[in-house]
């Protein structure tokens, strides 16, 4: 059984600005959990759409009751694949993100669509959908509730991070100074581990956007 969640967001910046900020989001004070990001591939289609795939390494501390279901070396980090397509003619950007780590325990798939706000052409609206599933017998509901709560927290941080980067792009004084995204040891560990995950990301099944 899959738990579905949907929400909307609004950024008071143009669609073009948001698209630029999307590729410059990290680091920001609200993304301490993002350790690394790598572009796996990128191409421009005959219709001038930009298609990209990124591999993200994030910290992902599980609650104690979940840790026993995870390998010790994977209990504190996760690999995420992010596919995106930017359509300059339709003025839309669609992203699809899903985890390739811990997927047997819990799978979180997110789809976002960025488009011009119909009421104000200088603003950008975001439709965000998530599908959270787990097949752990007896713990499915608890794991899904945990995943949903963490997802909602992540959305809040994502929006604040966007606003921070957009403000910096537009010359505003940031409300907070840049925090360290991780300790050097965490970064070194993530850099070593991500090499193994790159192969998984490059062979992962391409998701559909419709």
Predicted regions and their residues:
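Terminal "cap-and-tail" regions of soluble proteins that handle hydrophobic small molecules
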Residues: 2-8, 69-76, 85-210
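Generic alpha-helical secondary structure signal
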Residues: 19, 30, 34, 83, ...
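A generic structural signal for short beta-strands and their flanking turns/coil linkers
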Residues: 35, 48-52, 78-82, 91, ...
